[in-house]
Amino acid sequence: MNNTIFDDVFRTMIEKMPYLAVPLINEVFHTSYPEDVKITQLRNEHQQKDGEIITDSCLLIGKKMYHIECQSTDDTTMAIRMIEYDFAIAVENAEKQGRRYRIEFPRSCVLFLRSSGNTPDYLEADVIFPDGKTHVYSIPAIKMADYTKDHIFEKNLLMLLPFYIMRYEKKKHDMRKNLELLQILLDEYDEIRINLEKELTETGKAELYTNLTKLIVKIADYIFEKEEDIRKGIGDVMGGKVLELESERLKAEGEARLGDLINRLIQDQRMEEIQMASTDPEKREQLYKEYGI
C-alpha cells in the first residue's frame, strides 16, 4: 500500500495550517500555548554525510523545538529512526558558546495512524554514553485509535480529523454487505461535518473548514478506493458544504473583481462602459484583460 498520501496530507496541514498542530502539542507535552502563538517552521531536510534525512515536521514555539512524525504503520524500528531524526535536528540547531557547543534535542512524538495492542505508549531506547551513564530516550506515541470524534472536538485536535476514517479501514469489506454499518459511518461523518462547520465557519474560518474537509475526503477516497458506494456517501456528506463555500468564495472574489473594474472605469472617465461591464460577460472579460485585473 502506498502510504505517501498520509505524509502528504500531514505535511500539507503542517505547512499551510501549522496552528492546527498547537492543540496536539498541548495535548502531548502538557503545554498551554494559545492558538495564535507564533510558530516558526524549521527545515525538514537535514543533510548528513551518508544522505539526506527528511522529517515530517519541525516547529519552533518560543525557544522550544517540536518534532512530530506521522507513521501509518507500527514500525518497530521507529525509536531508532526518531533518535536519528532528533540528533540531526539538534546538531543543525546547535548553539556555539566559545569553543563549546550546546545541543538541545527537540520535544518529539510519533502519531501512529494504525496501531495494535503491541504498540507501546512510549518508544524507548537506552542510550549509553562513553562515561557509562545511561539515558532512556523516550518518545510519546499518539495512537489515532485512542481518539473518538468527541475527544477530538473537545480537545480541538482538528489535525487528527483527516485520519479519523482509519478506524473504519478494517470494516470496509463488511460495509459492502451491511448497509447498517455504512449508515453508522455516514451518520458519524455527518456529525463531524456539523461540528466542524460550527467550530470554524461561525468563527470566520470558512477557508480552514474548506481545506480541512478536502483533506478528510482525500484520505477517505484513498482508504475506500475500491468501495465506490462508501466513497460517494462520504463525499456527499462532507463535500456538499465545501462546494457551497467555494461557490460563495468565488462569488465574493467575482464581486470584488467587478468592483475594482468599475472603479478603474470611473477613474478613466469611461462612464458609458460601466453598464456594459455589469451586464455583458464578454465585454467584462475584455475589460479585465485590458486592465490586467
What are these regions (language model features)?
Residues 29, 90, 94, 165-170, ...:
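Hydrophobic/aromatic-lined pockets within catalytic cores
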Residues 153-181:
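Coupling/switch segment of ABC-type P-loop NTPase heads
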